[in-house]
């Protein structure tokens, strides 16, 4: 009976990846292998940081100079009139500086910043080091950075979140925000000289809105697990090697995620497919390359248009963004949660880069890859790994295989990794000794960020959605009830507990996975069972110690820490920062902030009480959205309908029960101070917010239907009960 019950439990819970990866064994890693021996897994993560960290133990961050490196100079044509630098290990991403030939009235050469890191503090640190380098290299004594343009390669916070730090250090203000009526225009564009241009693809702001308001709260919580923010840091050399088990060692595409305050600045110029941009005297092709995000861009700097002889043909320098996602298998799906990433679109964008004659490729994560042979090898194998994952998933999907079955079938050929052993990356190149050690070249397709199983499941979901075609999944027994029935099936809680304990005492990864799955049944039925919680936590620690992918190991170890606490513990206090930073929320369009009220509504409560009030917001004057703006929030049938009012203020007032007016400057200040958010009453008594209609009690009654900010981030490792 017990054997039958446990088999039923396995069928109910799914294999959880049991057969998706080979059992732990030799230290050899491969594109399909996510687990190795515990000490070896930690050691490989430590060695992987050699892609990022400098050899100076006290200062892991450093700036790479493409003008002095023999590796970068090998195929660089003579006569180029711009210089390029790459700031590494200031955070998760890389921030690049291009020094152009154009000068200001002070004679200083103007610059372009590509990607801004994740927060203002990281950007200021990189900016200060760039300023010191600039003064040293160009014989200047500047106190501000001579920035003409900032380019976001895409919307993610580690590429946009530090923009306010750079703008604080710039010698002029940002250009006015682009008029939405003319957004997305392609063609030639010469950057203005009297302000800092903010350049990006037209979809960036919409994506920032999504992660800062729509899905930001849950993605923020999941990011804490994925990046190991609750774990002790294992950055730097360990003694002995491999002794950092349980710590956050690397983030795979960067050494760590900076924890400062993130911000945003809406762009001054966007494009759709290609922008021929001239800024700081540098002529660039800004190319749309949807891949890791649907708003990704790459920057190609043609040699012949930037000082080199015309005889060089169509060669140039490439800023590849995250089309090649650093030294790791691409994150075709991110564990923190993302909208669908099409693998087909991604490898097609890789092809766009393959078709460029690049002598050096500067990515937004990790060091540059220079010399045509290296670039083409990496791009080709990166393309092939993604296409194989995509095509073979479709092949088996069309045979009727489900996601759990697909991860057992789709195995990318090892040859795409083995080929990379001939690649020469920057840290291994002769004459480049700024990194803390040599690297494994095959890491560019080893699961240090994404993984094949993640990509397989995402591909299935993108084409046919969540339903696996077995009707048993249409209306399953609720999880808690299913767990209780499973325990009853084997006659006792104790039987399942002993099964979990026995599996935990095993030696294979499959044993530890099974222990975690059995313990999950117990914890789901009885969340206060600390013995079961401990077994599940210990199983996660054993799995985390063997996971080569830091996203996986950090999640295992963080989940174990959560399980160590009794039920009801606030494991992670809610903090309005990161993706949901109030600074970011204050910089998005007003309409999007108002729209965020809709998913904070307690629909059941509003429907039961037949709530039908209408609240009006009037913002006057506005700064970033061109004119006064009025909105109506109408409660009805457990939803709140938002109307963007197009009529007069007087007519608007007749359509609402309660009306509030404030300037955009006041709204932004209240958001930044965390004094006004969905579910809260604005400080009417301050005099900055005017109550045009209704009473303060009416306002309280209306906002009482909405959730305020939570006290804690949602628990993720403990099943809902």
Identify the residue ranges that each predicted region occupies.
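Signal peptide processing junction and immediate N-terminal pro/mature segment
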Residues: 12-25
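Metallo-beta-lactamase
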Residues: 65, 79, 109-121, 182-186, 190-195, 259, 263-265, 274-278, ...
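Accessory terminal helices/loops
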Residues: 22-60, 207, 211-257, 354-360, ...
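Active-site metal-binding motif and surrounding structural segment of the metallo-beta-lactamase
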Residues: 65-66, 101-109, 120-197
């Amino acid at each position: 009976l017990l054997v039958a019950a446990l088999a039923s439990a396995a069928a109910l819970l799914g294999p959880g990846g049991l057969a998706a990866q080979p059992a732990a064994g030799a230290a050899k890693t491969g594109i399909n292998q996510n687990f190795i021996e515990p000490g070896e897994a930690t050691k490989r993560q430590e060695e992987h940081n050699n892609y990022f960290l400098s050899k100076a133990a006290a200062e892991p961050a450093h700036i790479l100079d493409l003008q002095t490196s023999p590796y970068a100079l090998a195929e660089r044509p003579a006569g180029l009139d711009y210089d390029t630098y790459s700031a590494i290990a200031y955070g998760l991403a890389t921030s690049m500086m291009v020094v152009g030939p154009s000068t200001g009235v002070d004679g200083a050469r103007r610059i372009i910043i590509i990607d801004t890191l994740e927060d203002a503090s990281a950007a200021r640190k990189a900016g200060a080091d760039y300023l010191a380098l600039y003064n040293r290299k160009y014989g200047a004594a500047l106190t501000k950075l001579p920035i003409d343009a900032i380019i976001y390669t895409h919307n993610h916070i580690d590429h946009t979140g530090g923009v306010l730090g750079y703008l604080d250090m710039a010698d002029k203000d940002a250009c006015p925000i682009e008029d939405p009526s003319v957004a997305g225009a392609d063609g030639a564009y010469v950057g203005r000289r009297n302000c800092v241009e903010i350049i990006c693809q037209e979809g960036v702001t919409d994506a920032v809105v999504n992660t800062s308001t729509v899905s930001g709260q849950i993605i923020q919580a999941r990011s804490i697990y994925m990046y190991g923010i609750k774990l002790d840091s294992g950055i730097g050399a360990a003694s002995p090697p491999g002794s950092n088990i349980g710590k956050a060692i690397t983030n795979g595409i960067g050494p760590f995620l900076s924890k400062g305050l993130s911000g945003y600045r809406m762009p001054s110029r966007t494009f759709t497919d290609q922008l021929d941009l001239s800024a700081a005297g540098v002529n660039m092709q800004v190319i749309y390359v949807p891949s890791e995000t649907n708003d990704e861009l790459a920057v190609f700097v043609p040699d012949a248009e930037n000082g080199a002889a015309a005889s060089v043909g169509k060669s140039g320098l490439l800023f590849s963004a995250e089309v090649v996602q650093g030294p790791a298998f691409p994150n075709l799906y991110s564990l923190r949660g993302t909208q669908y990433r099409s693998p087909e679109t991604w490898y097609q964008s890789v092809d766009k880069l393959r078709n460029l004659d690049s002598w050096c490729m500067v990515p937004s994560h990790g060091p540059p890859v220079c010399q045509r042979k290296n670039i083409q090898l990496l791009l080709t194998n990166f393309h092939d790994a993604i296409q194989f994952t995509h095509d073979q998933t479709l092949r088996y999907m069309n045979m009727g295989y489900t996601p759990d079955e697909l991860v057992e079938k789709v195995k990318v050929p090892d040859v795409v990794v083995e080929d990379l052993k001939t690649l020469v990356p920057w840290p291994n190149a002769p004459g480049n000794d700024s990194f803390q050690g040599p690297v494994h070249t095959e890491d560019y397709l080893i699961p240090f960020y994404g993984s094949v199983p993640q990509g397989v499941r995402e591909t299935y979901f993108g084409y046919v959605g969540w339903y696996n075609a077995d009707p048993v999944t249409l209306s399953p027994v609720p999880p808690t009830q299913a767990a209780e029935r499973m325990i009853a099936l084997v006659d006792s809680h104790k039987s399942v507990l002993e099964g979990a304990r026995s599996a935990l005492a095993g030696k294979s990864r499959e044993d530890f996975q099974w222990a975690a799955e059995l313990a999950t049944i117990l914890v789901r039925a009885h969340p206060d069972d600390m013995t079961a919680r401990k077994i599940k936590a210990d199983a996660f620690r054993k799995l985390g110690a063997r996971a080569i992918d830091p996203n996986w190991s950090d999640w295992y170890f963080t989940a174990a820490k959560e399980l160590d606490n009794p039920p009801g513990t606030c494991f992670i206090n809610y903090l309005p920062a990161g993706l949901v930073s109030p600074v970011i929320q204050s910089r998005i369009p007003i309409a999007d902030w108002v729209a965020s009220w809709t998913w904070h509504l307690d629909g059941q409560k509003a429907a039961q009480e037949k709530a039908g009030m209408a609240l009006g917001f009037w913002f006057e004057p506005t700064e970033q959205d061109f004119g006064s703006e009025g909105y109506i929030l109408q409660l009805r049938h457990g939803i709140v309908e938002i109307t963007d009012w197009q009529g007069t203020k007087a007519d608007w007032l007749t359509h609402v029960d309660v009306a509030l007016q404030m300037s955009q400057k006041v709204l932004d200040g209240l958001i930044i101070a965390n004094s006004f958010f969905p579910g809260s009453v604005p400080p009417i008594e301050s005099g900055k917010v005017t109550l045009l209609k209704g009473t303060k009690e009416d306002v309280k009654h209306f906002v009482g239907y909405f959730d305020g900010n939570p006290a804690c981030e949602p628990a993720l490792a403990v099943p809902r009960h």
